[in-house]
Amino acid sequence: MAVDSDYVTDRAAGSRQTVTGQQPEQDLNSPREECGVFGVWAPGEDVAKLTYYGLYALQHRGQEAAGIAVADGSQVLVFKDLGLVSQVFDEQTLAAMQGHVAIGHCRYSTTGDTTWENAQPVFRNTAAGTGVALGHNGNLVNAAALAARARDAGLIATRCPAPATTDSDILGALLAHGAADSTLEQAALDLLPTVRGAFCLTFMDENTLYACRDPYGVRPLSLGRLDRGWVVASETAALDIVGASFVRDIEPGELLAIDADGVRSTRFANPTPKGCVFEYVYLARPDSTIAGRSVHAARVEIGRRLARECPVEADLVIGVPESGTPAAVGYAQESGVPYGQGLMKNAYVGRTFIQPSQTIRQLGIRLKLNPLKEVIRGKRLIVVDDSIVRGNTQRALVRMLREAGAVELHVRIASPPVKWPCFYGIDFPSPAELIANAVENEDEMLEAVRHAIGADTLGYISLRGMVAASEQPTSRLCTACFDGKYPIELPRETALGKNVIEHMLANAARGAALGELAADDEVPVGR
C-alpha cells in the first residue's frame, strides 16, 4: 500500500511556503552546501529515530528542509517540511513513523526553489499501487532531458499551482513509472545509466532500501553495519553517531539493495572516480572519512602546506571557525607561529526562513563571529579561512579584526582561487560574482583580491598542494571549480542554473516544447 507524502503533514500544510529573495549576508558569501542522505534497514530498531539522528549528523549539508520516509512492509509514510531537522520533527511525529526501513534527507537547493513541494524525500505511487520514496544528494546535468521524458510519459504536471521542480522529483517519477512493469530494482538498473551528473541516491519501497552513487563518485556515500541491520549515509560521521560500524564506501556506478536476504550489489556503469576535492576543504564534517582519508587530517595537512607555500612573519595564527580551524592548526604547526583562538562563533546562527531586516543584514558577519579582543589586540595575525567566494565576508572580517586591535592581517586561504561554478551539487555564485575572476592575470588577481578585502598580504594554497593533502590521485578528483576542467559534459540547459525545471515547466505551460533546451550539446562554461 502506498501512502502519499501529504499523509502526516497537517502541521506542515499551513506553512507550504516558497522562500525567495535575499538570504543573510554570511550565507551569500560562502560556498553553499548541497544535501545529506541517510538510509537504514533494521527490523526491530526504531528506524525513524535512527534516521533523525543521522540527519542531525548531516545537518551541515543542508538547512532548508528535512524529511523522513518509513515503511513497515505494507505502506510507505513520508513526513517533510521546511526548516532544520530539529524544527521539522518532534517526539510525536517520530513515534507515529513505525517500520523497519527508512530514508532521510536534509536539503540545500541546487535545483528548484525552496518550497515545501521540493523538500525530500520525494514520493511517487507506482501503477501497481506500491510506493517509492527517494532522497538525492548531487545535481543532474541532464535534468531537462529527463524532465522532457517524464512529461512525455505524463508523469509531471505543468499547470498545477505548485508542482515539484527538482531533478530529484523527476528521478522519483521515472523510477516509479519503470517499476510498473518490473521490480523497483530493475527499474533503477534501467534508469540509472541514462542519468548524467552527480548523484547519491537513497530510495525505498515497502520492504527494501536502495542506495546508489553516480559513475564518477562526485559525492561521498558509505555503507555501515548495525547489530540488526544496515545503514547508508552521505558521511561516515553519521554512521558513528547512530552506532553503526563503517563497512566500505559505496563504489561509483554501484547500486545496493538491502532487504531480508542481505545486501546485493550490482554495477550499472563502469566507474570513473572524480570525487569532489571541496569535500575535504569545506563541505564534509572534519570527523568524517572520505576515500580512506580523514577530513580533519586533510585540512591540517592543507594548513601545513599553506605555511610552506605562503610564509609570513607574525605573532599569532587564528582560524575562521569552523572549517578554517584545522588548517590554521596545521599552519601554526609548520610555521612555528603560535596558534590561538581569536574568533568566537555563534553556534546558533544558521540559515533562516525569516527575511532579515536591513538592520540585521548590516550586522553581517558580526552575527556569526566575534573577536576575542584581549587575544588579538596589538598582534600581527595570520587569519586562515577555507575559501574566498565573493570576498565580502573576508572584507568584513578584516575590518572587524582591525577595529579589535590587530596591527597586521595576513589572510591565508586553504583552497586555490574559486573561478568556476559548480554544476555537481554546490551552489556557487555565477562566474561574474566570483572575486577571483575580476582580473585574468594571476599576480594581478592576487593583488586585486588583497586590496579588495583590505588585508596586508594574501596567499592561497596551490591546487597541487591541496590535492596532495587529500592523498588522492589528481586523476580521481574533480577540481572543476578551481581549474574549469569538468569531468561530466555540460548540456546547454546548465546555463539556466538551479531553476532549469521551473523555466521549462513555465515554457510548457505557455505551449513551448519542454525539451527544446534539452539538447545534449556540450557547451563551454566561461568565466
Swiss-Prot record:
Disordered: region residues: 1-30
Domain of life of the organism encoding this protein: Bacteria
Biased composition, class Polar residues, residue ranges: 15-29
Catalytic activity of the protein: 5-phospho-beta-D-ribosylamine + L-glutamate + diphosphate = 5-phospho-alpha-D-ribose 1-diphosphate + L-glutamine + H2O
UniProt propeptide residues: 1-34
Binding locations of [4Fe-4S] cluster: 276, 422, 478, 481
Gene Ontology BP terms: 'de novo' IMP biosynthetic process; purine nucleobase biosynthetic process; purine nucleotide biosynthetic process
Pathway: Purine metabolism; IMP biosynthesis via de novo pathway; N(1)-(5-phospho-D-ribosyl)glycinamide from 5-phospho-alpha-D-ribose 1-diphosphate: step 1/2
Cofactors required: Mg(2+); [4Fe-4S] cluster
Binding site for Mg(2+): 323, 385-386
Record bears the keyword Hydrolase: no
Glutamine amidotransferase type-2 domain span: 35-261
Cofactor binding comment, as recorded: Binds 1 Mg(2+) ion per subunit. Binds 1 [4Fe-4S] cluster per subunit.
EC identifiers of the protein: 2.4.2.14
Keyword annotations of the record: 4Fe-4S, Glutamine amidotransferase, Glycosyltransferase, Iron, Iron-sulfur, Magnesium, Metal-binding, Purine biosynthesis, Transferase
Residues at the active site: 35 (nucleophile)
InterPro entries xrefs: GATase_2_dom (IPR017932), Ntn_hydrolases_N (IPR029055), PRibTrfase_dom (IPR000836), PRTase-like (IPR029057), PurF (IPR005854), PurF_N (IPR035584)
Molecular-function annotations in GO: 4 iron, 4 sulfur cluster binding; amidophosphoribosyltransferase activity; magnesium ion binding
Gene3D superfamilies: 3.40.50.2020, Glutamine Phosphoribosylpyrophosphate, subunit 1, domain 1
One family name in Pfam for this protein: GATase_6
Recorded family membership: In the C-terminal section; belongs to the purine/pyrimidine phosphoribosyltransferase family.
Entry-linked HAMAP family: PurF
Biological function: Catalyzes the formation of phosphoribosylamine from phosphoribosylpyrophosphate (PRPP) and glutamine.
Family annotation (NCBIfam families): purF (TIGR01134)
Full protein name: Amidophosphoribosyltransferase
